[in-house]
Swiss-Prot record:
Protein known as: Amphoterin-induced protein 3
LRR repeat ranges per the UniProt record: 62-83, 86-107, 110-133, 134-155, 158-178, 184-207
Gene: Amigo3
Organism: Mus musculus
Compartment(s): Membrane
Domain LRRNT, residue spans: 25-61
UniProt GO MF annotations: protein-containing complex binding
Listed GO biological process terms: cell adhesion; heterophilic cell-cell adhesion via plasma membrane cell adhesion molecules; negative regulation of neuron projection development; nervous system development; positive regulation of synapse assembly
Amino acid sequence: MAWLVLSGILLCMLGAGLGTSDLEDVLPPAPHNCPDICICAADVLSCAGRGLQDLPVALPTTAAELDLSHNALKRLHPGWLAPLSRLRALHLGYNKLEVLGHGAFTNASGLRTLDLSSNMLRMLHTHDLDGLEELEKLLLFNNSLMHLDLDAFQGLRMLSHLYLSCNELSSFSFNHLHGLGLTRLRTLDLSSNWLKHISIPELAALPTYLKNRLYLHNNPLPCDCSLYHLLRRWHQRGLSALHDFEREYTCLVFKVSESRVRFFEHSRVFKNCSVAAAPGLELPEEQLHAQVGQSLRLFCNTSVPATRVAWVSPKNELLVAPASQDGSIAVLADGSLAIGRVQEQHAGVFVCLASGPRLHHNQTLEYNVSVQKARPEPETFNTGFTTLLGCIVGLVLVLLYLFAPPCRGCCHCCQRACRNRCWPRASSPLQELSAQSSMLSTTPPDAPSRKASVHKHVVFLEPGKKGLNGRVQLAVAEDFDLCNPMGLQLKAGSESASSTGSEGLVMS
């Protein structure tokens, strides 16, 4: 009995062991190096809202997007992103970062988007963003930034969107852009800061593609006439930054915050501004017209020779020597831009960017190129000529009908046809008597009867001939035209029809 109990216990233990092994084989394995407090999904790693005070360790190397927002991170360790060679987007918003430190983004050259918004950053030093050569979008809004080093963004050659709104910046260098340059930058948000002074010449020298998305609203700017004329011109040109936030552009009439008024709704504040001060602030773009297939050359003429020249196409493509990507545009050694054969895709604004040590600030020149299709050749036989020819032919036919005599053969045919249809071959005595009475009657017939009778034959009495059997002989004139009964005339003779009638008419 004891042997049987021991055997049963051993079998149960063996079955339990086999069941555990099978269960482990069914469950999916945990993701490779995924922290327990994070969520890993393919190449996305989310550690948001976990209350982290320090960076997690042993992150998966396959991550292309890392979300560490809504935590309590206070600092970033140098080189902490080195294992993440595939990282393209890093979200660090809503933390407690006060400084970035040198080397925080070393080995993150593949990063395209960096979100540092809603932190506690107060300064941005020259080397804080080293290693981000391919960065395209940088979000620094809703911090406490009060100062930017002159070269704070040096090395971010691919940066196109920079958001610095909702900070405490009191100045910004539009000439140097703190190391950014103008070749790639398309969006610059400086709204809701403490900007009290802006260099108007530097602002006017910016290219149009940057002015279009340069946000300066909600700043305590002074109500300056030059600034008013410049922003007014941008508003009239329909730049989106002015159009979208028209009511948010304000200025201070006095040096107190309570004197803030809206730029475009209180124009009476600027009624004493001279309009003559407006020209010269901003150079107008030069208008050029070209036809498809023509050659075009644009020159970047600056006040002094420039050492570096670059162009921006209407498609926001940076053009430097030797040529564009499609090969249709070439940048020559002297800095000019040449288009061999103009096409419709070349229509738009070309911007020349010139810089150099002898230039006080970067200069930009703009060319608005309008491309027109070649005019088609005029038609050799148009509708107007056809109409004129038809009128001439019609006039010739009318003149021939009026003045050309008809052919004799046609007249004989007409007379034969009319003789057969219009005049009977033998008339009865009753018909002759009716003709006499209608001719010699002194009372004209009624108007309706006259209108109804269309074919009337004129008859007359021949003088010198007596009536036969008590009747007057009626004769038709020898020149009686059977084809034209309306044009008949009485036969001329020595005696009139009245005297003929005096010989006496026998009526039955």
